[in-house]
């Protein structure tokens, strides 16, 4: 074991844990069997923004890689992948795209593990069309705290399966999984882009009575600095996988994503401030086409633009940053408007603020997505008055029947989980069945009381 200082991707709450890189399943079993009072948690590539994969004073299983679990395979006749939990979506895509298959769901980064994708039940720009990652998982093998390995699927142990999907690693260690891929003709995306002048225009374009449902992928960047008539203005981007004909000549399935640049080794805390972000937002909005424009983009450019900047999470300096994501029902558009007005009115600067319309929820009691509007934004952790502002927004979200995404959370109070996730008690019962010794634990779980009844 090695003592290691860890944080989430937001680089805010650093804690020290004993870390182990297991060589095989037996070593995972040994570590779990020796977990002390502080417990153990699995960690993949560390892309959760908060403390979901940290365990101060306890143990952390460092799981990225392919040493643990069944080896990777892709059946090109069915599109079914078998992958070790520590394998990244990046590695899956590098093999699958040239063979005509794409992951069913991807978040804004491909540097997440298969196990992390399930534990966080990741979603993407296509939730209104394809749901979240867990809905495409056919089966997974999970090691319980007893050391036993169980196979879970929607048909076999469905209660435990859905408790693990979105369960934040607190039901067991996912060893490997089978999931169904999406067939594609090319490594390109047909993209339609247009800028919209204000909040009402953005919501109208993305509403169910518009044409949003005809696009597999849909997302709008929102300018959180703009006020007045421009409040909530955005750049709407929608698309689908390009056909071979649309992709043009050459090898239409060629796929080799690159890291183009690296963040500087040191960044002052005030580099991303209200003035610099306001200038960036103005340029970003103005460069978007005033009328709907159709173009062809690569998979990395459309899905994972920030992956092209190595270490982009350091750009907020040593203070780190918070990524805040919530969802409210589709009927609560006015609450969404008031939230955006609150951020704009207080001058909270965010260059990365995105709005998506989500589809129906799945059966996982702790899965974040449900039918509604979800807004995600990055903010420097040191902004004056930010905790008080977020507390006000939390109340607005919860009173509207909304909730927060735990994979990104570093802020909400324990009560927010009970209010936002009405099936929390159901999840806790399944979790206790799987881990009666309560060996699995994390800094996130302790802060939010996720293992506590009442």
Please report, for each region that a protein language model flagged, where it lies by residue.
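Noncatalytic alpha-helical scaffold of FAD-dependent oxidoreductases
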Residues: 1-454
């Amino acid at each position: 074991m090695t003592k290691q200082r860890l944080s989430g991707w937001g680089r805010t709450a650093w804690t020290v844990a004993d870390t182990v890189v297991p060589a095989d399943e037996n070593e995972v079993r040994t570590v779990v069997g020796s977990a002390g009072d502080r417990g153990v948690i699995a960690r993949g590539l560390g892309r959760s923004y908060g403390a979901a994969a940290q365990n101060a004073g306890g143990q952390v299983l460092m799981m990225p890689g392919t040493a643990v679990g069944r080896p990777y395979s892709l059946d090109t006749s069915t599109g079914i992948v078998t992958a070790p939990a520590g394998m990244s979506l990046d590695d899956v895509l590098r093999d699958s795209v040239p063979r005509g298959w794409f992951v069913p769901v991807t978040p804004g980064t491909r540097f997440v593990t298969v196990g992390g994708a399930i534990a966080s039940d990741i979603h993407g720009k296509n939730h209104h069309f394809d749901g979240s990652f867990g809905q495409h998982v056919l089966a997974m093998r999970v090691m319980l705290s007893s050391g036993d390995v169980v196979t879970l699927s929607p048909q076999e142990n469905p209660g435990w399966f859905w408790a693990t999907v979105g369960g934040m690693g607190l039901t067991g260690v996912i060893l490997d999984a089978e999931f169904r891929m999406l067939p594609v003709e090319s490594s390109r995306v047909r993209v339609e882009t247009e800028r919209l002048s204000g909040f009402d225009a953005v919501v109208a374009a993305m509403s169910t009575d518009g044409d949003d449902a005809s696009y597999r992928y849909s997302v709008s960047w929102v300018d959180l600095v703009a006020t007045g008539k421009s409040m909530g203005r955005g750049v709407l981007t929608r698309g689908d996988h390009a056909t071979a004909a649309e992709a043009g000549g050459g090898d239409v399935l060629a796929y080799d994503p690159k890291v183009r640049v690296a963040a500087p080794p040191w960044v002052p805390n005030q580099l991303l401030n209200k003035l610099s972000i306001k200038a960036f937002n103005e340029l970003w909005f103005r460069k978007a086409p005033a009328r709907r424009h159709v173009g062809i983009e690569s998979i990395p450019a459309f899905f994972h633009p920030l992956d092209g900047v190595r270490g982009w999470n350091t750009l907020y300096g040593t203070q780190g940053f918070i990524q805040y994501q919530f969802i409210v029902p589709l009927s609560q558009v006015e609450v969404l408007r008031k939230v955006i007005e609150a951020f704009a009115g207080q001058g909270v600067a965010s260059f990365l603020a995105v709005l998506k319309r989500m589809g129906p929820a799945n059966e996982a009691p702790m899965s974040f997505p449900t039918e509604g509007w979800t807004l995600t934004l990055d903010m420097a952790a040191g902004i004056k008055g930010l905790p008080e502002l977020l507390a006000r927004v939390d109340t607005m979200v919860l009173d509207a029947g909304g909730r927060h995404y735990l994979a990104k959370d570093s802020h909400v109070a324990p009560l927010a989980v009970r209010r936002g996730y009405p099936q929390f008690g159901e999840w806790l019962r399944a979790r206790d069945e799987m881990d009666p010794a309560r060996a699995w634990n994390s800094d996130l779980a302790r802060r939010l009381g996720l293992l506590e009844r009442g």
